[in-house]
C-alpha cells in the first residue's frame, strides 16, 4: 500500500523580528547625524502587519526606507514580503509612506504556484490550495524534493516557506 507524502507552502514573517527591526531602525535614526533635528518616525502596527513611516522630506524618506530594509535583512525578515506603498505628501515638505507585510499567500499567487507545479509535469504530484497555504502531495518523497527545488528557483514575488513535511 502506497502512502502519500506531503508538505505545505506558506509565507510570512516573524512579527517579533519585525518589531526588533523597527526598534533598531528607530534607534539608528535617533543617533544618525543626517537625522538630527528631524521629525522622522517609524510606527509598527502588529494587528494590521504594517509599518508607517513619516519623514521631513523625500531624501530622508528614502534613507529611512533603506535603513528599515537593512535592519529587516539583518534580522532575517524576508524583504520580498514587504510592499512599500506610495509616498503621500503631508503638510509642508513632510511625506508619509506605509510598508505592508505579506503574512499569507494570496489566492492569485497560490493559483500561480499550483499552475507552475502542474505545468512542469511532475509525476503523480498534486497541488491544492488550503486557505492561505498550498499543500503538495505525492507518493514519492523524491518528487516532493524535486518540487521544492523547482519552487526555490521560481520567483512568485514572495518568500516561500516549506513546512509540515509528512512522509
Give names to the regions the model predicted.
Residues 36-47:
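Short edge beta-strands and adjacent turn/loop segments
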Amino acid at each position: 500500500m502506497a502512502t502519500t507524502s506531503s508538505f505545505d507552502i506558506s509565507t510570512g514573517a516573524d512579527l517579533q523580528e519585525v518589531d526588533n527591526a523597527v526598534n533598531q531602525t528607530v534607534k539608528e535614526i535617533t543617533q544618525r547625524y543626517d537625522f538630527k533635528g528631524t521629525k522622522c518616525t517609524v510606527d509598527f502596527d502588529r494587528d494590521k502587519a504594517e509599518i508607517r513611516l513619516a519623514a521631513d522630506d523625500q531624501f530622508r524618506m528614502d534613507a529611512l526606507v533603506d535603513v528599515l530594509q537593512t535592519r529587516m535583512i539583518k534580522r532575517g525578515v524576508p524583504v520580498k514580503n514587504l510592499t512599500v506603498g506610495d509616498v503621500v505628501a503631508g503638510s509642508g515638505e513632510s511625506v508619509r509612506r506605509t510598508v505592508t507585510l505579506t503574512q499569507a499567500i494570496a489566492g492569485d499567487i497560490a493559483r500561480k504556484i499550483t499552475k507552475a507545479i502542474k505545468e512542469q509535469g511532475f509525476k503523480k504530484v498534486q497541488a491544492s490550495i488550503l486557505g492561505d497555504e498550498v499543500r503538495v502531495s505525492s507518493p514519492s518523497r523524491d518528487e516532493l524534493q524535486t518540487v521544492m527545488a523547482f519552487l526555490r528557483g521560481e520567483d512568485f514575488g514572495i518568500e516561500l516557506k516549506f513546512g509540515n513535511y509528512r512522509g
